[in-house]
Regions:
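Hydrophobic h-region of N-terminal signal peptides that target proteins for export
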Residues: 9-17
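Second-shell loop/turn segments in exported
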Residues: 33-39, 107-110, 135-141, 167-171
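Helix-loop-strand module that forms the ligand-binding subsite of alpha/beta enzymes
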Residues: 70-158
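N-terminal beta1-alpha1-beta2 submodule of the flavodoxin-like/Rossmannoid cofactor-binding fold
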Residues: 19-102, 179-186
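Conserved beta-strand segments of alpha/beta enzyme cores
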Residues: 57-59, 158-161
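Glycine-rich phosphate/pyrophosphate-binding loop and the adjoining helix
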Residues: 160-186
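Positively charged n-region of N-terminal signal peptides that target proteins for export
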Residues: 1-4
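Solvent-exposed, acidic/flexible segments
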Residues: 38-42, 113, 117, 141-144, ...
Length: 186
């Protein structure tokens, strides 16, 4: 009887483990000179993405433009504003995982003029996210949780409005940012 119980328990655990969701934390983030926090070595959104990946056990995927943005803030925003005005789709570097193989996706980006940075649109137009669950998180300095409606339209996914954290909090008050992440990610 004990052997049968052990076998059944093993089978149940195996089924339970097989049913776990594969989680991806995909984000765009920019270091260098940033609004409000100056020159930084790690972008605000990257800091939050790492917290979420650690909390969920998810795989990190950094979306990177093939051509880096200028390091200076003013030069960067000039390029980014032009991309937005042209609805550009800048080339991105190849990624090391297939995002289509994941069940649940956390998507993070800094809010630039009420939108995701344009390399994120390139990413989402390249990969099929239809039917997936996307949980959004953003860093900002006053725009709040922006870009979600357009993300729904571009992906066809079940996009949830999620977490908005000030960039200066992500950068300079990491304990506070971690508490916000912990409260949001269940």
């Amino acid at each position: 009887m004990k052997k049968i119980t052990l076998i059944l328990l093993s089978l149940l655990l195996g089924v339970s483990m097989a049913a776990e969701k594969k989680i991806l934390v995909v984000y765009y983030s920019r270091a260098d000179e940033n609004y409000s926090v100056g020159n930084i070595s790690k972008g605000n959104t990257e800091i939050i993405a790492e917290m979420i990946a650690k909390k969920t056990g998810g795989t990190l995927l950094h979306v990177e433009p093939a051509k880096e943005y200028p390091k200076g803030y003013d030069d960067c925003i000039n390029v980014a504003k032009k991309e937005l005005a042209q609805d550009a789709r800048p080339a991105i570097k190849p990624v090391n995982v297939n995002p289509e193989e994941f069940d649940e996706i956390y998507v993070g980006y800094p809010v630039w003029w009420g939108e995701m940075p344009m390399p994120m649109f390139t990413f989402f137009e390249k990969y099929n996210m239809k039917g997936k669950t996307i949980n959004t998180f953003v860093t900002h300095e006053g725009s709040g949780l922006s870009g979600v409606a357009r993300l729904k339209k571009v992906t066809g996914a079940n996009v949830t409005a999620g977490l908005a954290i000030y960039g200066h909090v992500a950068q300079n008050e990491r304990d506070k940012a971690q508490k916000e992440v912990d409260k949001w990610v269940k």
